[in-house]
């Protein structure tokens, strides 16, 4: 069975896309990231979330940029801390997107 980590149901959370197995919307996950919450912080505060589920929420936002435009930096990356390279290494390849799921590389000085 394949799990769809981001779901949308008009009868749940007023139709706002949410993370499977939780009552957190994609918007709430993005707000937490923009406010500086790391992956470890999110999992500690919301143990019902899964590493791949959070990554899917970030990828969903990237695929729906118009809906979540306020969470994107000018360079196209999501605001706030992303996954470290070590954390992202455990994810399926389609989620290892620099600047979206994985922390954006710092520009060379």
Regions found by a protein language model. Give the residues of each.
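Short, Lys/Arg-enriched N-terminal segment that forms or immediately precedes the first helix
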Residues: 3-18
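Anion-recognition interface
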Residues: 21
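Long, charge-rich, low-complexity alpha-helical segments
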Residues: 24-109
